[in-house]
Amino acid sequence: MPQSTPHVPPQVPVLPALDTAPTGRRIVAIWFPHWLSEIVMPAEKRDAPFVLAEHQRGTQRLAAVNIAAEACGLHTGMALADARALVPDMHIEMLDPARGAAALDKCARWLRRYTPWVGADTHPDSHGLLLDISGCAHLFGGERRMLDDMRARINRRGITCCIAVADTIGSAWALAHYGPDS
């Protein structure tokens, strides 16, 4: 009788199967779609539109928006003047790239609780981390439990994340960015 693939909740996209004996490389991609705004804005104030702006080619543009600002139609790259016209009462701060990088480095060090192989996603405009969990998942009760634990711990800190696991970096990255519920 063929072995069936275990049910995988949609919030954790996985290729090709979970909880199997490690036969190759398994890569976790974690994408933080609102990283910059979430590390700057206190969790209790996140219901209000908040943006980070930066100087770009002679004008101020939105470098990051929180979920509330996104719901109002604001998006990264938009001119700050246009954003103010749409949402005059939004909270605005200037982008500090060093702060975002330092916080991502701290998160990477914290994620070493799961594997020693943690690195930054170097794709431009993508705040994320890549973890090689090959041979580590069984220590946490399998891939599903490991990923659920990662997500829960990250979410408790008030950070939105999309997590996926696959056999290659590209597949895991694509699933985290464009997969179901990402």
Descriptions of predicted regions:
Residues C136-F140, D181-S182:
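Short, charged/polar, Gly/Pro-enriched secondary-structure boundary elements
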Residues A164-S182:
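Long, highly charged, low-complexity intrinsically disordered interaction regions
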Residues R156-G158:
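Secondary-structure boundary elements
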Residues M1-L130, G135-A137, R144-A152, C161, ...:
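Residues that scaffold, gate, or flank divalent-cation-dependent active/transport sites
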